[in-house]
């Protein structure tokens, strides 16, 4: 499939940018948080990266209209890195399902108390918000990692608008 972009120097549309980023495969995460009323919120996210090792910090980019972002602004959030069998969770948390947490098994993490999708995530990071900044229609949230849970499993990937599974050589 050939994707054509505007000529250099021309205005880049949201569709152009989305098509470009679809060519960059990445892992799939579900960002979780609990609002002031104790209600869990979550959304599928592929805009996640490590920032620094000292202190251990990562960033996520969340849509400003997201209910999950509102809960994250409470000061803590969880990052659930989905394993190869976590596609259903990725789909549930990327749609307008009313009770997303009723569709998956989850529990409160030990240190931060954030929702951990224990059956769908091969890794979990509990984070404390250190800084956030608005850029366009998204907010970049920097979280200092205070908790890590890991299991050995193959990650779920997303690229070219499709889910895939890592298949290591060897």
Curated annotation (Swiss-Prot):
Read off the Pfam families from this record.
Answer: Flavin_Reduct
Q: What is its EC number?
A: 1.5.1.30
Q: Which domain of life is it from?
A: Bacteria
Q: Which UniProt keywords apply?
A: NADP, Oxidoreductase
EC class, as a word, reads oxidoreductase
**Enzymatic reactions:** reduced riboflavin + NADP(+) = riboflavin + NADPH + 2 H(+)
Q: Name a GO molecular-function annotation.
A: FMN binding
Primary role: Catalyzes the NADH-dependent reduction of FAD to provide FADH2 for the halogenase RebH.
Entry's family note: Belongs to the non-flavoprotein flavin reductase family.
- State the protein's name: Flavin reductase (NADPH)
- What is the species of this protein? Lentzea aerocolonigenes
